């Protein structure tokens, strides 16, 4: 076989993965790839010389020349054996380091080679490097990384270059480092590189030894603690008269705590309490306190979660099944869920952190009672597949309601948030903070301030309940709040929430809700079958308009339940087998109607204008009546339980009339010598708000000029002394009330024109809206003859005196309290 001086210039190539062969070594090589098998067979049919060279990337299955290093080892093939599976096992003897000048690819790789020039080496430097290499190798070998036989073989080498090759082969260096040793043909350079690698290996061995010592110390410590703990259990058992259950109590808590997967800081604090319990007599008063505390801690879901179902289509289906209408609310909820789904998908791809998934606005549902705020929160939890917890905050006056009591107090308990988490059994429930606008405050603290930490996404992952004394992560909880009056929510708390407004239901929506949800539920609750009772649409419409007066449907469901119970009684006593409830038969079941809707005037009247108001239970119209009494000078009398703001609107209207007296041809002498009385029925109901300014001005100017106000026009808007007409709120509810009263024309501020789109289309198409920017424009629509009649001089015969009875031609119905104009 050829030696290093007689190698062929072109030889077959056998690529290998993850290993390097050095000269003078004898090595087995397994070949399974076609390119390697073909090269071995070519070598055996030729001069039995083959080039062993490493791949740069071991994952390449079909290597080409560029995938291989340029320095390899020329080897003599000693023996080849074919395995039953077709693979080959080759025994080679490495001859020399060679430089590859070019690779050629056919059925197998061949290489043009030439031996590497070793250069000159020797002298004192080589001797010093040799001694240093032997010393470092002995140090590394003493660490047990090389077996004794290999150490003996290496130490027996007389050639220092050959010794260096064997050291590099036997130590666990990276492929790049082993290849660098192969490419170092000069012995001096080879020793320098190897010494650098041995220095690194020594440092690694030192760190490993330190880690092993620490692990051994920790194991010894745990074994010692276990031994002492077992001794304590035996001693406690003897002290307690053999009561094994008491002796195992601390251990039972410890086992539960270990299973919770707490972070080290929290676990350290809780373990301290367990150790205190273990040292106490079980009948000690403090032991009972600690026992209760540990029970709370171990029952909290520190790492238990519900799997989110963020299917937007399924959520939409659930919301539609559970609620009728509320389209804007549903759209916002679905947008919220869609954003959370996209965030979760990005977190799964590693594009954002897991903490970012749960960040987002805290939703607060605002609106009158009974419009579905609480039930839609339940539907959100249902669609997400999360547990649902409702926390009623109405009347809460103590900070401890939120944060809990400190354990120093007798009967201390966690706050309602932690109690809700334990009730849910998961750390990511949907928690409804109900009636958040009705939080109180006292000398014991302000619960709304405590809620700031709960609802702040940047703080609530470290929420600390006073009772627990350790942080609990609330960042995965989905908080939803509800309120009837958002203006009563503290500003700092409101700033952390996004408002979703629930409007009052219109009569058509109530009718559909009654047929789809309320009737089936009441039939089920009262034991009736659908074929035993039926309601006509006219009966339900009369129930809505004459027996209930609300924005939602709670009272409507109660009235349906009352009818259902009476029918159930008749069926149970055999008086009837089934009942069909019509509008004419309602009085038989419910008595006389309790509400008579306000209706428009039947004729145009002087001094009587029609305004609009709304309350939490819906909107309606009101009448502003003005009477002029001569003989007493310059006074303004206001009656009808008007609030301060409404009184100021009347004074502003009078000032506006006086400042425009000449233009409107108002008798100034009569004005100065008359007392003006403004009354707003019904007098038993408090009224407040600025939006009656237009109605006040129309009524006053109508009375002062004798020009009648139109009976088919209702108005809302705030006026200024300069005659501007300013925007107001609650337009939808007011218009719905006006339409119910038969009004066809609505005067509203120009700035509120955009709110007309919130009114259902079938109502908008049956009414006419008059957006106004000034009071002059209001008067032009509201008075008979308009602004032209005002600005035209009038004789006494043309002036119609104000009617003595402001109620002529209409009937006055009952209104809900706290009407806001």
From Swiss-Prot:
GO annotation, cellular component aspect: cytoplasm
Ranges where the Lon N-terminal domain occurs: 11-202
Major subcellular site: cytoplasm
EC number: 3.4.21.53
Reactions this protein catalyses: Hydrolysis of proteins in presence of ATP
Residues spanning the membrane: none
Location of the protein in the cell: Cytoplasm
Binding site for ATP: 367-374
UniProt KW keywords: ATP-binding, Cytoplasm, Hydrolase, Nucleotide-binding, Protease, Serine protease, Stress response
Active site positions, chain numbering: 691, 734
Boundaries of every Lon proteolytic domain copy: 603-785
Annotated region (Disordered), positions in chain: 792-821
GO MF, one annotated term: serine-type endopeptidase activity
Top EC category: hydrolase
SMART domains: AAA, LON
Induction record: By heat shock.
Gene Ontology biological process: cellular response to heat; protein quality control for misfolded or incompletely synthesized proteins
Pfam families xrefs: AAA (PF00004), Lon_C (PF05362), Lon_lid (PF22667), LON_substr_bdg (PF02190)
InterPro entries in UniProt: AAA+_ATPase, ATPase_AAA_core, Lon_bac, Lon_bac/euk-typ, Lon_lid, Lon_proteolytic, Lon_Prtase, Lon_prtase_N
Main function: ATP-dependent serine protease that mediates the selective degradation of mutant and abnormal proteins as well as certain short-lived regulatory proteins. Required for cellular homeostasis and for survival from DNA damage and developmental changes induced by stress. Degrades polypeptides processively to yield small peptide fragments that are 5 to 10 amino acids long. Binds to DNA in a double-stranded, site-specific manner.
Quaternary structure (record): Homohexamer. Organized in a ring with a central cavity.
Family that this chain belongs to: Belongs to the peptidase S16 family.
Stored HAMAP family: lon_bact
Name of the protein described by the UniProt record: Lon protease
Gene responsible for this protein: lon
């Amino acid at each position: 076989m050829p030696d290093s001086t007689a190698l062929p210039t072109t030889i077959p190539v056998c690529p290998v993965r993850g290993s390097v062969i050095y000269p003078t070594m004898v090595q087995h090589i397994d070949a399974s790839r076609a390119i390697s098998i073909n090269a071995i067979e070519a070598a055996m049919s030729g001069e039995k010389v083959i080039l062993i060279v490493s791949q740069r990337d071991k994952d390449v299955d079909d290597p080409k020349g560029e995938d291989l290093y340029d320095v390899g080892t020329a080897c003599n093939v000693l023996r080849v054996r074919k395995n039953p599976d077709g693979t080959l096992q080759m025994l080679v003897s490495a001859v020399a380091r060679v430089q590859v000048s070019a690779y050629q690819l056919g059925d197998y790789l061949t290489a043009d080679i030439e031996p590497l020039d070793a250069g000159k080496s020797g002298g004192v430097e080589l001797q010093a490097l040799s001694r240093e290499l032997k010393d470092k190798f002995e140090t590394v070998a003493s660490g047990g990384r090389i077996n004794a036989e290999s150490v003996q073989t290496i130490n027996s080498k007389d050639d220092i270059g050959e010794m260096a090759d064997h050291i590099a082969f036997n130590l666990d260096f990276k492929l790049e480092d082993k290849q660098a040793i192969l490419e170092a043909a000069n012995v001096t350079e080879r020793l320098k590189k190897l010494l650098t690698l041995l220095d690194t290996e020594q440092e690694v061995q030192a760190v490993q030894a330190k880690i092993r010592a620490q692990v051994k110390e920790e194991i010894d410590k745990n074994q010692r603690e276990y031994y002492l703990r077992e001794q304590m259990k035996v001693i406690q058992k003897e002290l307690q008269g053999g009561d094994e259950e008491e002796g195992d109590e601390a251990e039972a808590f410890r086992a539960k705590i270990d299973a919770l997967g707490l972070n080290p800081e929290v676990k350290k604090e809780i373990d301290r309490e367990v150790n205190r319990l273990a040292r106490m007599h079980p009948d000690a008063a403090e032991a009972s306190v600690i026992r209760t505390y540990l029970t709370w801690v171990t029952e909290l879901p520190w790492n238990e979660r519900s799997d989110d179902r963020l299917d937007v289509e399924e959520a939409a289906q659930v919301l539609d099944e559970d609620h009728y209408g509320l389209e804007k609310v549903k759209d916002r909820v679905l947008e919220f869920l869609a954003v959370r789904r996209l965030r979760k998908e990005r977190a799964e791809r590693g594009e954002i952190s897991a903490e970012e998934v749960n960040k987002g606005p805290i939703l607060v549902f605002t609106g009158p009672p009974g419009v579905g705020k609480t039930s839609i929160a339940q539907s959100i939890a249902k669609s997400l597949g999360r547990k649902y917890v409702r926390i009623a905050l109405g009347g809460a006056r103590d900070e401890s309601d939120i944060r809990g009591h400190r354990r120093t107090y007798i009967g201390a308990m966690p706050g309602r948030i932690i109690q809700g988490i334990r009730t849910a059994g998961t750390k990511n429930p949907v928690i409804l903070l109900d009636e958040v606008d009705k939080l109180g405050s006292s000398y014991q603290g302000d619960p709304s301030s405590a809620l700031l930490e709960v609802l702040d996404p940047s703080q609530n992952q470290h929420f600390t309940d006073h009772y627990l004394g350790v942080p609990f992560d609330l960042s995965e909880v989905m908080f939803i709040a509800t309120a009837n009056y958002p203006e009563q929510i503290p500003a700092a708390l409101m700033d952390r929430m996004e408002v979703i407004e629930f409007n009052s239901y219109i009569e058509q929506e109530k009718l559909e809700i009654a047929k789809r949800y309320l009737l089936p539920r009441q039939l089920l609750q009262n034991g009736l079958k659908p074929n035993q009772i039926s309601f006509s649409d006219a009966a339900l419409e009369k129930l809505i308009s004459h027996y209930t007066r609300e924005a939602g449907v709670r009272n409507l469901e109660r009235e349906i339940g009352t009818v259902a119970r009476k029918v159930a009684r008749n069926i149970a006593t055999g008086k009837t087998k089934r009942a069909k409830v019509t509008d004419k038969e309602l009085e038989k079941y419910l008595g006389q109607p309790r509400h008579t809707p306000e209706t428009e005037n039947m004729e145009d009247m002087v001094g009587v204008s029609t305004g609009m108001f709304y309350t939490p239970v819906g909107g309606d119209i009101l009448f502003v009546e003005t009477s002029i009494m001569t003989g007493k000078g310059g006074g303004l009398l206001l009656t009808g339980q008007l609030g301060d703001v409404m009184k100021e609107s009347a004074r502003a209207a009078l000032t506006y009339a006086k400042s425009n007296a000449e233009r409107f041809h108002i008798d100034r002498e009569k004005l100065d010598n008359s007392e003006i009385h403004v009354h707003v029925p019904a007098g038993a109901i408090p009224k407040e708000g600025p939006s009656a300014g237009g109605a006040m001005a129309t009524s006053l100017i109508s009375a002062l000029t004798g020009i009648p106000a139109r009976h088919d026009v209702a108005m809302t808007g705030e006026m200024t002394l300069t005659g501007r007409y300013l925007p107001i709120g609650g337009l939808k509810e007011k218009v719905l009330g006006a339409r119910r009263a038969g009004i066809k024309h609505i005067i509203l501020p120009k700035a509120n024109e955009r709110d007309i789109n919130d009114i259902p289309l079938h109502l908008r198409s049956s009414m006419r809206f008059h957006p106004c920017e000034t009071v002059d424009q209001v008067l032009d629509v509201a008075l008979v003859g308009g602004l032209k009649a005002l600005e035209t001089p009038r004789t006494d015969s043309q002036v119609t005196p104000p009617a003595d009875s402001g109620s002529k031609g209409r009937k006055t119905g009952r209104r809900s309290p706290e009407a806001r104009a």
